[in-house]
Amino acid sequence: MLCVAASTACSNQPQPNSADKTFVAEMVPHHQIGIDMINSAVLRSDDVRLRKLVFQMQSYHEHELHELSSHLQQWKISSAKIFPGLIDPNRLAKIDELTGPAYDIAWLKAMIEHHNGAVAIGKMQMKLGQIPSLIDVAKKVVTTQQAEIIEMQKILAEK
């Protein structure tokens, strides 16, 4: 196997198929929105459980975004404009106008919707993708975000 030192690709690395490219094109803006939502909750939520969850989300979102963005650039593809879990910027602006429990409830509902979109994107990659590292990212997205949905639903049920 020959690998070029400066390249991330090896000669036996499969070429990305349309599912791989779609996964990257959708997950990059998806994670960018997620990070914006997370940053909002860091500043605005007073709920200890929600803040703990948000800090957990923050670290892996940034790591995955960096990894996925490198594929976006390498493959010279654009971010998707529409994708599962896309939250309307006007809705996010209205959420940011809220305070206290009203903010937390609206934020949780939006993030659950957002996570459900990531799970759908991840499952599609697991089914149709062929780049092993991206399939691994998809598995992590599905597993992690399904667990977070359950946690957010618990927090929401107690509001």
Q: Where are the regions that the model predicts?
A:
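C-terminal motif of bacterial Sec signal peptides marking the signal peptidase cleavage site
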Residues: 6-9
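All-alpha RGS (Regulator of G-protein Signaling) helical domain and cognate RGS-like helical scaffolds
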Residues: 11-159
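Sec-dependent N-terminal signal peptides
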Residues: 1-2
